């Protein structure tokens, strides 16, 4: 494509001229390697952006595609690339016969330097030299002659307008110029030489290397002399910045390179040139372009200052000013914010304001700080500001240090590097650089147990008094936080600390035993909530004699609680009616109450938690003459049971049960005095606004596993109730996971175990021996748990037997078909959520218990036959039986079977009202003949007494063995006189067998918790759940 064709392709003269300017000013980069290739890539610098133009070539013609937003086939960038490609193609095909060159005759010729500069082309520095030839007799427009080559006789120049070759005898030039021209010829043959009009462009690194190795004197000289009083030129005021990185001293140009007119020498300041060769830019630029000139100028200026130059001046259209009058001064600070855990830098510039003779402060990242009225008094040097700030950010490598906001500092040298960077930074008057004190100064830690002077305890808190030299609480917390994150240093507000120092290790070892989340301080005192009293006393006793720290009443309280010593005011006959462990439980409850604590009574099912609470309440009301009511929150099925227990053991206390219509309950609440109010979970939820208007003496929640879900409305309602003493009753404080325990404590001792996230991070996620030990140690003073095996030696044995049965062939086939169909459906679902998997498991468990096909129920069920065999044998031996199942239709199926076989039975499930449930239990316990109680596992597992039963059958295996055990213990409890036989009927080669295997595998972890059984299946991953089918 010719120039004329390119002009036509551009369509408009304006577009062609713009493209021509891009091409002529060196803003188009097209590597020579693409010249003879079928496809290639060019880059165009356009308005500070790099535009990429891809092209395919065929027969010298280009088809281009541009990355710009214009999205046209003939944009200005494509036109510029076509011009560049045309030039390179013409030059590659051009060949000249040197013997036919047009000879220019003269007596003497000389090189006239037209311009000198450095240009950055495609990421590398090039030396640019433009020169013309001056002839004393004939001068054919020297500006259009370009150096072509040179030999020992002639210098050849190419006429750019008519593509003709001209020659001049080499001998006509002075010796230095002859050597220079021969040197140019050598460079042109060794390197890829670029041309810009009549200028030569050489790669700077190669150019300097060859020049320094050259032995012949040329017009090039190296000069490291320092020149003072340098004047920098600023051409155009409207640009608000430097647009020429060039200096003058007198009449001498002081650029990166300088041309001495008189001596006809080009002076290269090699020290600066070598410094600048390290810079790499991803695009083609010219250093005289404004947006790149200022950053480049700053690096040049800072180098001069480091090399000892002092006085600099700037020239505008109407004046010459000193550097400080023209350039703004940077104030740059790097600091670490220990509260936000952030490394931050702040920078601002101060400009001389010529309008009001003052200064204007400008924040680069907060432009609004520069007042609009000040704009007439100074000009912002935006790119200069950016260059200066980036320079100092690079010096401190802030990107490297900011990674420590997320990663631990594991070597103190990593923090010492800040001070090293500041020390290595040579000060210049262009900037004032500083670091925050906490990055510069290391401070030794002081720790001594002797600093603890006294401990005082009141109704709400513990006061620890320390000597003035002791470490403050805020710093202790910060040190522990840094330590737990894996840091070996701790950065405080004013200094940093080495955590590997002996004193720091001792401090961490000591204070790491405390829970300081709720601790406060006022100088030399640290305050802890009172519920940490026993833990604090135990820790201090390892190091000091606590009798020298606590007052006598406090020491007695600690010893009494540890030894469970409490003087009850109950009559001797009443208290002696309780078993010894129950008396201990009453004392324990009263001790917690007197010390303003709360607690969890977690005795195993069947040990009489209800009666212990009743006697504690009775003793408290009699001894303290309490005028407030107390509140007991229970499942609906236990309302009447609690009422009857109060009537039996404490008839002198008035009891109100909120099992009346809602319209009447409001009046009941208003008239409460020193009475006991018993409400169900549901009534509490609906009447929470009315109930929370009252303050209670005791607030007791029975079956406290009902508030394990902290987001449920019942849990939220329970935690709103105001009471002097809060107590939770549960046989399974940890039913599913450790968070169950947290929720109970959040009711009885709010904040004691931190918030939910803190507890999860510390205990739930870790699940290590150390975390379990810490949890048990912290909670043990406030949990009382006894098991039947330890306190009831006279209680008969509970014998558990697992009976494995094989499904008959038809049943097994039905099971496997359902299993395979379900797994295939899960496989097809993209979202393999645990819900889909658990649904399949539930179906299979149900199918094991009650085989159904399209025709109805299959009568020949191996599990049913095994259960009936046990039941028939028990009835023959005059024994009552409880059969637990999860499925209502299994209960109905057995009901029909018992009718046919004439077996007496009772049904106890969620379909029965609380009142009728109480009646059913009494009928079953009082029945004279052997009979069967068909009970749903959940309904039968809460608050009932079934000691008449001697045989317990679990027809379908439950996820959570804690729930199974809880149901079993309704028969195996106080009052049981005979051995209880427990049977679990398990179908082999089914999901039931796999569930039992996984439960057994978890026993090691279970043994470390507060209860015998934990429902691990709720925490299994989808992959672990799917492995149950293997």
Swiss-Prot record:
Pfam families membership: Helicase_C, SNF2-rel_dom, SWIM
Any one GO molecular function term: zinc ion binding
Residues annotated as domain Helicase C-terminal: 867-1021
Keyword vocabulary terms for this entry: ATP-binding, Helicase, Hydrolase, Metal-binding, Nucleotide-binding, Zinc, Zinc-finger
EC code(s) of this entry: 3.6.4.-
Zinc finger residue extent: SWIM-type: 51-86
Family: Belongs to the SNF2/RAD54 helicase family.
UniProt-recorded name of the protein: Uncharacterized ATP-dependent helicase MPN_020
Organism, as annotated: Mycoplasma pneumoniae (strain ATCC 29342 / M129 / Subtype 1) (Mycoplasmoides pneumoniae)
């Amino acid at each position: 494509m010719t120039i004329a064709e390119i002009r036509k392709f551009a369509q408009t003269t304006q577009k062609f001229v713009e493209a021509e300017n891009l091409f002529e000013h060196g803003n188009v980069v097209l590597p020579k390697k693409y010249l003879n290739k079928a496809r290639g890539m060019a880059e165009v610098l356009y308005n500070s952006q790099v535009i990429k133009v891809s092209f395919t070539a065929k027969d010298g013609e280009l088809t281009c595609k541009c990355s710009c937003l214009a999205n046209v086939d003939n944009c200005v960038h494509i036109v510029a690339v076509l011009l560049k490609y045309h030039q390179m193609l013409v030059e590659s095909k051009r060949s000249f016969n040197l013997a036919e060159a047009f000879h220019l005759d003269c007596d003497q010729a000389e090189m006239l330097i037209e311009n000198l500069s450095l240009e950055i082309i495609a990421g590398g520095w090039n030396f640019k030299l433009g020169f013309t030839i001056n002839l004393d007799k004939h001068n054919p427009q020297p500006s259009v002659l370009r150096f072509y080559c040179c030999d020992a006789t002639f210098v050849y120049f190419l006429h750019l307008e008519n593509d003709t070759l001209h020659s001049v005898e080499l001998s006509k030039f002075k010796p230095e110029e002859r050597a220079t021209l021969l040197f140019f010829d050598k460079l042109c043959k060794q390197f890829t030489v670029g041309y810009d009009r009549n200028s030569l462009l050489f790669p700077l690194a190669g150019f300097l290397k060859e020049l320094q190795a050259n032995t012949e004197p040329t017009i090039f000289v190296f000069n490291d002399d320092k020149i003072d009083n340098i004047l920098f030129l600023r051409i155009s005021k409207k640009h608000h910045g430097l647009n020429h990185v060039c200096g003058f001293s007198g009449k001498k140009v002081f650029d990166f390179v300088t041309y001495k007119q008189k001596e006809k020498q080009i002076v290269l300041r090699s020290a600066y040139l070598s410094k600048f060769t390290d810079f790499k830019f991803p695009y083609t630029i010219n250093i005289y372009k404004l947006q790149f000139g200022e950053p480049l100028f700053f690096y040049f200026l800072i180098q001069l200052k480091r090399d000892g130059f002092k006085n600099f001046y700037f020239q505008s259209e109407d004046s010459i000013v000193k550097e400080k009058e023209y350039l703004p001064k940077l104030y740059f600070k790097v600091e670490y914010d220990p509260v936000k855990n952030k490394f931050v830098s702040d920078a601002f510039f101060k400009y001389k304001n010529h309008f009001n003779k003052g200064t204007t402060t400008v924040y680069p990242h907060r432009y609004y700080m520069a007042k609009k009225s000040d704009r007439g008094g100074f000009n912002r040097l935006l790119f200069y500001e950016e260059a200066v700030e980036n320079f100092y950010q690079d010096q401190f490598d802030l990107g490297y240090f900011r990674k420590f906001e997320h990663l631990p500092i594991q070597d103190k040298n990593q923090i010492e590097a800040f001070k090293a960077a500041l020390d290595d930074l040579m000060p210049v008057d262009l900037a004032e650089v500083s670091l925050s004190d906490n990055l510069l100064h290391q401070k030794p830690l002081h720790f001594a147990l002797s600093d603890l002077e006294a401990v005082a305890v009141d109704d709400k808190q513990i006061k620890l008094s320390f000597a003035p030299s002791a470490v403050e609480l805020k710093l202790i917390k910060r040190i522990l936080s840094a330590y737990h994150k894996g840091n070996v240093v701790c950065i405080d507000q004013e200094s940093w600390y080495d955590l590997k120092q002996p004193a720091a290790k001792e401090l961490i070892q000591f204070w790491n035993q405390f829970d300081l989340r709720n601790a406060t301080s006022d100088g030399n005192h640290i305050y802890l909530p009172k519920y940490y009293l026993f833990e604090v006393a135990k820790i201090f006793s390892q190091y000091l004699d606590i009798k020298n720290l606590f007052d006598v009443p406090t020491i007695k309280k600690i010893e009494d609680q540890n030894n469970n010593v409490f003087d009850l005011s109950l009559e001797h006959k009443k208290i002696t009616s309780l078993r010894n462990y129950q008396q201990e439980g009453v004392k324990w409850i009263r001790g917690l109450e007197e010390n303003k604590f709360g607690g969890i009574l977690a005795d195993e099912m069947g040990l009489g938690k209800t009666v212990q609470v009743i006697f504690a309440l009775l003793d408290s009301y009699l001894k303290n003459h309490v005028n407030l009511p107390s509140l007991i929150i229970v499942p609906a099925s236990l309302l009447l049971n609690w009422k009857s227990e109060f009537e039996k053991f404490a008839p002198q206390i008035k009891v109100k049960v909120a099992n009346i219509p809602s319209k009447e309950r409001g009046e009941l609440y208003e008239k409460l005095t020193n009475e006991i109010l018993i409400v169900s979970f549901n009534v509490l939820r609906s009447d929470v606004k009315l109930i929370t208007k009252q303050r209670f003496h005791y607030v007791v929640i029975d079956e406290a596993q009902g508030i394990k879900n902290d987001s449920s409305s019942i849990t939220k309602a329970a935690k709103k109730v105001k009471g002097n003493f809060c107590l939770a009753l549960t046989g399974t404080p940890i039913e599913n996971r450790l968070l169950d325990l947290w929720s109970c404590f959040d009711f009885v001792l709010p904040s004691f175990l931190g918030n939910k996230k803190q507890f999860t991070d510390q205990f739930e996620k870790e699940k290590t021996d150390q975390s379990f030990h810490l949890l048990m140690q912290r909670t043990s003073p406030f949990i009382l748990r006894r098991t039947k095996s330890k306190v009831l030696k006279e209680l008969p044995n509970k014998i558990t037997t697992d009976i494995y049965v094989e499904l008959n062939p038809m049943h097994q086939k039905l099971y496997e078909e359902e299993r395979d169909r379900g797994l295939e459906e899960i496989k097809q679902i993209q979202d393999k959520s645990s819900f889909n998997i658990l649904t399949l498991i539930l179906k299979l468990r149900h199918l094991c218990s009650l085989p159904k096909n399209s025709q109805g129920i299959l009568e020949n069920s191996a599990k049913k036959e095994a259960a009936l065999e046990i039941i028939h044998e028990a009835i023959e031996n005059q024994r009552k039986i409880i059969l637990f199942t999860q499925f209502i239709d299994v209960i109905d199926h057995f009901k029909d079977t018992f009718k046919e076989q004439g077996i007496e039975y009772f049904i106890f499930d969620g379909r029965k009202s609380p009142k009728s449930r109480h009646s059913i239990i009494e009928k079953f316990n009082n029945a004279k003949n052997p009979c069967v109680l068909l009970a749903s596992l959940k309904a039968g597992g809460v608050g009932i007494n079934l000691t008449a039963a001697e045989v317990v059958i679990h027809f379908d295996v439950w996820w959570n063995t804690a729930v199974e055990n809880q149901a079993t213990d309704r028969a195996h409890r106080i009052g049981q006189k005979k051995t209880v036989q427990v049977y679990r009927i398990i179908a082999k080669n089914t999901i039931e067998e796999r569930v039992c295997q996984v439960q057994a595998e978890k026993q090691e972890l279970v043994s470390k918790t507060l209860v015998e059984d934990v429902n691990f299946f709720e925490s299994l991953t989808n992959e672990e759940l799917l492995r149950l089918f293997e």
